[in-house]
């Protein structure tokens, strides 16, 4: 199996694994808890997306990554982390704008994923990623599943509870 196939297989298994965890434990918990508390829980992991800045650090990567991938991925993750922090703060403060901030963060963060995955597959090879290889195989599946859960909550539960 070539290295790109290994990467894609790893990401797929990660998404399936986090999906199983979501179905068995997270979704039942979300249904049993207040809407804003659930959104806060799902938003917290995204605050740590600043780790994507490591795509810009040679030494963490085996060689400098193609800037057509590294730059938008790194700064897209930083923006997503800041937006997640704003949304989380609004949720914890029970701001009347908290759901709006969650929508903004979730749309921007999900769009960043689409761009980063597309650019990553196009311009970066797994062997160049060095230690950052663990971002797409561990963090991305968790964050992808949590984005989907946030969209699910915003679309289905928000109508019932606000």
Q: Where in the sequence are the language-model features?
A:
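Non-cytosolic membrane-interface motifs at loop->transmembrane helix junctions
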Residues: 64-75, 101, 126-138
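A generic, lipid-embedded transmembrane alpha helix
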Residues: 44-59
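Small-residue-rich transmembrane alpha-helices that serve as helix-helix interface/gating elements
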Residues: 10-14, 131-147
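Hydrophobic alpha-helical membrane segments
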Residues: 76, 80-84, 101-121, 140-143
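Hydrophobic transmembrane alpha-helical segments in integral membrane proteins
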Residues: 1-18
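Membrane-interface helix-boundary motifs at transmembrane edges
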Residues: 26-39, 92-100, 158-162
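Alpha-helical transmembrane segments in multipass membrane proteins, preferentially the mid-helix core
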Residues: 79-94, 149-153
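Juxtamembrane "helix-exit" motif on the non-cytosolic side of transmembrane helices
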Residues: 24-28, 55-64, 118-126
């Amino acid at each position: 199996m070539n290295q790109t196939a290994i990467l894609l297989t790893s990401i797929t298994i990660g998404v399936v694994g986090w999906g199983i965890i979501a179905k068995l434990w997270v979704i039942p918990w979300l249904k049993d808890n207040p809407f804003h508390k659930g959104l806060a829980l799902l938003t917290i992991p995204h605050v740590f997306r600043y780790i994507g800045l490591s795509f810009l650090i040679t030494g963490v990567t085996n060689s400098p990554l193609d800037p057509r991938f590294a730059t938008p991925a790194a700064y897209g993750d930083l923006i997503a982390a800041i937006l997640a922090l704003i949304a989380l703060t609004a949720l914890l403060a029970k701001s009347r704008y908290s759901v709006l901030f969650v929508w903004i963060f979730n749309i921007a963060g999900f769009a960043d994923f689409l761009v980063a995955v597309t650019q990553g597959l196009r311009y970066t090879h797994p062997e160049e990623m060095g230690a950052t290889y663990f971002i797409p195989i561990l963090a991305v599946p968790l964050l992808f599943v949590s984005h989907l859960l946030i969209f699910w909550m915003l679309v289905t539960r928000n109508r019932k509870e606000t």
